[in-house]
């Protein structure tokens, strides 16, 4: 499994809240977020770790991680640019602003690995925890396969994507083609489901996206809370 971290965005909402530090470098639990993710990916067992970082941001990364500068108009474009540099094989991909405790990263990685090995074209991290300005809702069948991707809330139970994706070699090829006509990650995910490609889901209790200052504060409280006292 190859690892890919997407950090090509501007972080405009954090900046609007007065956070001047670029999103990959904001500190969560005492370390830059991108360093947290790199070390998480290494601990999970990713064979390689590629970080797509917005041009102009200097990142000092640990270990074997590779940083590629990019200036792209959307996360889908950043994904495709990253996939072009990642070694062959399945990919475990995360947005740089994705926060979870280690146990949930391990649970998610194991699920992604299992579902890709079983033949899924892609795997989505999903959570019932909805705290996003523009959530992407997912419906699924009894086997955990996605049946629909929606911008507005569907029938209960509500699940939303969490910024982590497992991508098979087939999904990598489809993304390279789709980017010519699609301009958002959610449009690509919706396309996969509409094509009736097997898109699996792995559920975790909570995922925080670092879009605003309040998200940074919530992530800090969550990850530094005493064991058994996380909220």
Give residue spans per PLM region.
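Residues at the starts of beta-strands that form the adenosine-phosphate
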Residues: 2, 47-49, 90, 121-122, ...
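Short, well-ordered beta-strand micro-motif
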Residues: 27, 85, 139, 166-168, ...
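Well-ordered alpha-helical segments embedded in enzymatic catalytic cores
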Residues: 33-36, 78-81, 187-188
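Conserved beta-loop-beta/alpha segment of the NTase-like Rossmann-fold superfamily
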Residues: 58-142
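Catalytic-core segments of class I nucleotidyltransferases/pyrophosphorylases
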Residues: 92, 106, 145-231
